[in-house]
Amino acid sequence: NNFGGILQAYALCHILSNIIPQNEVYILTQKEKTFKGRLKKFLDYNSPAQKFIRQYIPINTLSGFTLNEIMKKNITCIVVGSDQVWNTKYYNPLYFLNFLEDNHTIKKISYAASLGSDLWYYSQQQTDEISNLLNKFNAISVRESSAINLLQDNLKIKATQVLDPTLLLQANHYNKFISDDNKRYCYAYLLDYTKKLNM
């Protein structure tokens, strides 16, 4: 239910579909493996965020992120991003496409990937693993200028700064999502939680 991440996924899919209309573009997700994960998904089914995803974002669910699964889907390119996919707090080798192993036929691209920090918090072991994986990418772009420096200083990898995908669409593109509901409500968009705001 990360509204920012959902809008980024929507915008990136929309842009890619316009650029390569002859190809299918969809979000890869993995089936929930734990009962707790499946229960949460079931309880969230009717949330506004999940309804939006079902209506506007093409999803393709994999039973597992393995090279065999990817090859079965005839996928030719995988794009990672945007949002804080490379934030140390959420470190997951999946976001560096480790499951593609040494496959050279599938293009690997990052679009507006974010580290979510101006400092490098990865351990040496993680840094070595990330360096190995990112060196297999065909193109790397990041959201913040600080990420360019972090990748260069810590991995000797060059990256390009690009716009967040939500900003690639005109503002009026989002008008269709705006509700005509006039009910009063309180809305808060919090990037970093604090004890005071999270009460």
Where are these regions (language model features)?
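Glycine-centered secondary-structure boundary/capping sites
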Residues: 56-58, 141, 156, 198
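Aromatic- and Gly/Pro-rich donor/ligand-binding loops
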Residues: 1-3, 7-132
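Helix N-terminus capping/helix-initiation residues
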Residues: 34, 61-64, 152, 170, ...
